[in-house]
Swiss-Prot record:
It comes from the Eukaryota. Residues 1-20 form the signal peptide. Belongs to the bfoA family. Glycans are attached at residues 26, 56, 75, 124, 175, 210, 280. Keywords: Glycoprotein, Signal. The keyword Transmembrane does not apply. The keyword Signal applies. Part of the gene cluster that mediates the biosynthesis of bifonsecin B, a dimeric gamma-naphthopyrone. The first step in the biosynthesis of bifonsecin B is the production of gamma-naphthopyrone precursor YWA1 by the non-reducing polyketide synthase albA, via condensation of one acetyl-CoA starter unit with 6 malonyl-CoA units. This is Bifonsecin B biosynthesis cluster protein A. The lineage of its organism: Eukaryota, Fungi, Dikarya, Ascomycota, Pezizomycotina.
């Protein structure tokens, strides 16, 4: 009996290492809640401006990994700082949802160094008559022992419904049909992107021969895009990346150009997107993660 009890005890002592990452921090739920709210506090405007100006936000580890369902994956602190904070930091610039002004976490569960949450973020859609619109964002976030984000996975819930609502709002403002509003949105986004291209994408970074060529391509050669196509060869994808051009023209000008760079391209099937091996660490907590198909090679 003593032998079996000793063996069982030894097994239990080894269990945490067998079931998870022994070097991962073990935060309390209260600490994880604080880390979660710290992120969202800094996501709001104008706090996000300060994060953006830092170039590499200290909320992220240098090699942070991020994935957003409607766009793509983002690697490194500089790129994530630009897309997470810079994308929503200018209320005077044309954009789909404008700037985030408030949030409410409505679902939250956490263990170890991982938190899963649903957050309703109120955006001021300044390009749509200062429409205050709630956007539901589901997130999984993992932190290191310094409280920095190691990796995250974000999903915009009901994003198609959101896009339809924005188009309907625009239709009402111009007293037009949905089709007319869609055409007006296409023209507005294309005009904005081409103006940004003319200002920042010069010399070796130039993507279009002139403004007319830019506008014609964006309005006739590619579709506006569906709700899941902000990371494909669409106008909506280029709208996302247009905001980043000012920060690093050499990197981002190709994203708004005809080739789409590495981001606005149709290089994935549905199955390839779903089965993409990406994350360095498993999101599975408390049980063996053998066979996790999302882990990178």
């Amino acid at each position: 009996m003593h032998f079996w009890w000793t063996a069982i005890s030894a097994g239990l002592l080894c269990l945490p290492q067998a079931l998870g990452r022994s070097d991962s921090p073990n935060y309390t739920v209260e600490e994880l809640w604080k880390l979660e709210t710290t992120f969202w506090d800094n996501f709001l405007y104008p706090a996000n401006v300060e994060q953006m100006e830092a170039i590499n936000s200290t909320l992220f580890t240098p090699d942070v990994q991020g994935r957003v369902d409607i766009t793509r994956v983002f690697n490194g602190s500089e790129l994530n700082t630009e897309y997470i904070f810079g994308l929503f930091s200018d209320p005077d610039h044309v954009s789909l949802v404008g700037v985030p002004v408030d949030y409410s976490i409505v679902q939250f569960i956490a263990q170890g160094n991982i938190a899963s949450a649903t957050t309703v973020v109120t955006f001021n859609a300044t390009s749509f008559g200062n429409l205050l619109i709630p956007v539901t964002i589901d997130t999984w976030i993992m932190w290191d022992s310094n409280g920095q984000i190691v990796q995250y996975d974000a999903t915009f819930r009901w994003f198609g419904f959101l896009l339809d609502t924005l188009v309907e709002t625009l239709a009402a403002s111009i007293n037009g049909t949905t089709s007319e509003a869609t055409a007006a949105l296409t023209q507005l986004l294309a005009t904005t992107i081409c103006a940004t291209h003319d200002q920042y994408c010069t010399g070796a970074n130039q993507q279009y021969d002139n403004n007319t060529a830019c506008y014609d391509f964006l309005t006739t050669a590619i579709p506006l895009g569906k709700d899941y196509e902000l990371g494909r060869n669409t106008l909506l994808c280029r709208e996302v990346h247009e905001h980043m051009v000012q920060y690093d023209p050499a990197l981002h000008c190709p994203h708004i150009g005809p080739t789409g760079g590495d981001y606005c391209v149709d290089d994935q099937t549905y199955a390839q997107k779903v089965l993409q091996k990406y994350f360095n660490q498993s999101w599975i907590v408390g049980v063996p993660s053998t066979g996790d198909i999302w882990l990178g090679d």
